[in-house]
Each structure stands twice: as structure tokens, then as C-alpha cells.
Amino acid sequence: MKSISFDKVLALKQAVHDTFGVNVHFHDLCSHSAFSLDEPDERIRAFIIDYFKKQGDRAVFNAAGTEFTLE
């Protein structure tokens, strides 16, 4: 798991909100960045995976599809 800069967090939140009208919640943990969604949505999940893949990172979601971290 890894951390990302706050600028990148804001860019992700803006991109998801502009595209889907929902909020991504950011959780700054001591060792890494974590994120959550209010409800699972396969379209948003795919968007986030692709978004980070383009930046050379990998978003890993939990089984419920509501939380993810980066690798």
C-alpha cells in the first residue's frame, strides 16, 4: 500500500465527482492512503482503476467494492 499527495487526492475526487456526481472519501492513514465510496458501483470502480493505471499505480478494491487502496 502507498500514499499519494493531497493534490492527487483532490484531482481524483474532482474527476469522479465531475463524471459520476458522487464523492470519494479520503482516509489518510499513517502508512498509506485509503479511499471509500458510499455505495458500490462497477462503473466508478472501473473508472478509478483506469484512472490510477494511467498514472502507473494500481487501485485495489475490497470485496464489497466500497473501499480501495493503492499499490
Language model segments and positions:
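N-terminal acidic leader/helix
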Residues: 1-30
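Acidic-enriched, low-complexity/disordered segments with a strong bias for Aspartate over Glutamate
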Residues: 7, 18, 28, 38-41, ...
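Short glycine-rich, basic-tinged beta-strand/loop micro-motifs
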Residues: 22-40, 65-68
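Detector for the mature cores of small, proteolytically processed
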Residues: 40-71
